[in-house]
Amino acid sequence: MRMNIYNNGIYQQDIESAWKLGNFNKLEGSRILITGATGMIASVIIDILMYYNSIINISSQGIHILAVSRNEEKARERFAPYRDSDFFTYFSHDISQPLPELGDIDYILHAASNTHPRAYATDPIGTITTNVSGTYELLSYAAEHYCRRFLCFSSVEIYGENRKDVDKFGESYLGYIDCNTVRAGYPESKRLSESLCNAFAAQKEQDFVIGRFSRVYGPTMGKDDSKAIAQFIRKAAAGEDIVLKSEGNQLYSYTYVVDAA
């Protein structure tokens, strides 16, 4: 699915539409570090920014992207069209470890995380350390290098289970999470990553924003994505029956990936 994404007319139209909605001139000359670069949302953000770079005047300063992920082979394939661009730099790094010296970074987008149930189950330690240690290391770098803004990719999972006292969650809602389960590592560590942002703002005056993304879907979903919506789409595309593991009465918010980006 990802191999042919640059040849998909619908996806390219979506990228162009997203560019038209943004005011990217304000980012001219900026250096933007994006972690989890090959992930569902981050890869779309990179495509949008690189689309902007492809149509700007030759004298423009452009937007410089530093893309970070763990799987270099996957990244080389995903971002092959940008390999020779002066505006794109990729490096492989475990963000739970301190960053190498990269110079000043204007914006950091922390999108690296295990984001589907199978990953939580098979790599619970990595899930927690990426969300907690990774956020700490990135915030530390941001604070030391006068980063203008830090964007933390969080999740609606921080709201926990509905206590049956509301029909819809507000931003201040906190439901139940059983912390003595492996599955709790994801929402609990996302909660802590948000707390770290607030701590750095209070102690280091680091500017930040948090995006609590709902259930995101779209063409950049990985083939190994085990979330329900990903399974539903794969089944439907293959002409197979969709299998529900519940009565299907729950109400969820879904966001198309380009809208999320």
Which sequence ranges carry the predicted segments?
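Non-catalytic terminal and boundary segments that flank Rossmann-like NAD(P)-dependent oxidoreductase
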Residues: M1-L33, D47
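SDR active-site strand-loop-helix element
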Residues: T35, V68, I108-N114, F150-V156, ...
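NAD(P)H-binding glycine-rich loop region in Rossmannoid oxidoreductase-like domains
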Residues: S92-T130
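Conserved Rossmann-fold NAD(P)-dependent oxidoreductase catalytic core, especially the SDR/UDP-sugar
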Residues: Y136-A184
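Glycine-rich NAD(P)-binding loop of the Rossmann-fold in SDR/ketoreductase-type enzymes
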Residues: Y107, D123-E137, N180, A184, ...
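N-terminal Rossmann NAD(P)H-binding glycine-rich loop of SDR-like oxidoreductase domains
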Residues: R31-Y51, I55
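Rossmann-fold cofactor-recognition segment
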Residues: P81-Q97
